[in-house]
């Protein structure tokens, strides 16, 4: 990262978080690196434990969340300690043998688990193996990306495997993640979230609305401008913060169409999107959800 990029990066952080919070986060990061280094020296030769470390984009969601749900449903938390690396406050009702630690705050206990766990699985903040003998995997988040991300995501050599949905998409995944193709680390078995579409559990639409619709459409545009990654992935002007819809008049026309068809459109804003850019508003047949409202629904 060049000096100008670093300056821009910190300006964005200060704008989004405030000066004191931005400085505090920077200090926490450096302390966390030191604690992690210190823990590596202590636990480099100790036995690996039956621990699974999980991380996902917005905690308990995406592929990490789907895999976690599977582990709990099948009772694997009785054999394995499950440790979550969290972006948000830890829930008070975690199941037996499940712990959570804030991903960006220094914690010797967190470092201990990272150094002694047999498995490290991540969706967003990529954890590679910390020491020999560990198995680490990148589960990815969302579906496969429909935008070119090569150069923005580079999987570390310490990652043992990356999930891939099909042979056809494998070279695209490799290019997006900065790994050679072919690469034996690519495992073509689909994603844990795919299982959600093949179960008999009723959906969660009732948490969003009590109305009945002929059709429900879920639109999940990827982020254009991130809140803290110093990235702006769109050169186009987006007055409402999302593509396609140019102004509130077009939203009103779309809402009128949905109303005539008795259809609901759910616009799910990407968790990393800078919410200050989002101007689209909910209407009778349009619901707008972001990372904060999703957590409130849970």
Locate each region found by the language model.
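Membrane-proximal basic amphipathic "stem/tether" segments
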Residues: 1-50
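Structural alpha-helical scaffold elements that stabilize or flank donor/cofactor-binding regions
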Residues: 112-114, 155, 210, 257, ...
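Donor nucleotide-activated moiety binding/catalytic core segment of transferases
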Residues: 103-117, 266, 271-298
């Amino acid at each position: 990262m060049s000096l100008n990029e670093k300056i821009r990066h910190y300006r964005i952080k200060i704008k989004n978080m405030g000066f004191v919070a931005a400085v505090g986060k920077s200090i926490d990061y450096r302390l966390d690196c030191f604690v992690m280094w210190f823990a590596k020296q202590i636990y480099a030769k100790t036995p690996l434990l039956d621990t699974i470390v999980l991380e996902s984009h917005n905690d308990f969601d995406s592929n990490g969340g789907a895999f976690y749900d599977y582990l709990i449903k099948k009772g694997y938390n009785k054999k394995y300690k499950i440790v979550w690396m969290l972006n948000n406050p830890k829930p008070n009702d975690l199941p037996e043998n499940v712990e959570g630690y804030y991903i960006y705050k220094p914690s010797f206990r967190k470092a201990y688990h990272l150094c002694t766990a047999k498995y490290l699985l991540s969706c967003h903040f990529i954890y590679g193996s910390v020491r020999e003998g560990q198995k680490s995997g990148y589960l990815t988040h969302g579906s496969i990306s429909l935008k070119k991300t090569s150069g923005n995501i580079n999987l570390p050599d310490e990652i043992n495997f990356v999930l891939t949905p099909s042979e056809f998409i494998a070279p695209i995944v490799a290019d997006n993640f900065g790994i050679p193709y072919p690469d034996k680390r690519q495992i073509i078995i689909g994603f844990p979230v795919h299982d959600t579409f093949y179960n008999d559990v009723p959906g969660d639409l009732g948490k969003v609305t009590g109305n009945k619709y002929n059709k429900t459409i879920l639109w999940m545009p990827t982020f254009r401008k991130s809140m803290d990654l110093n990235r702006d992935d769109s050169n186009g002007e987006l007055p409402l913060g999302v593509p396609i819809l140019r102004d509130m008049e077009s939203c009103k026309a779309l809402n009128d169409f949905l109303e005539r068809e008795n259809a609901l459109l759910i616009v799910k804003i990407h968790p990393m999107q800078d919410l200050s850019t989002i101007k689209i508003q909910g209407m009778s047949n349009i619901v707008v959800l972001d990372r904060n409202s999703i957590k409130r629904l849970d």
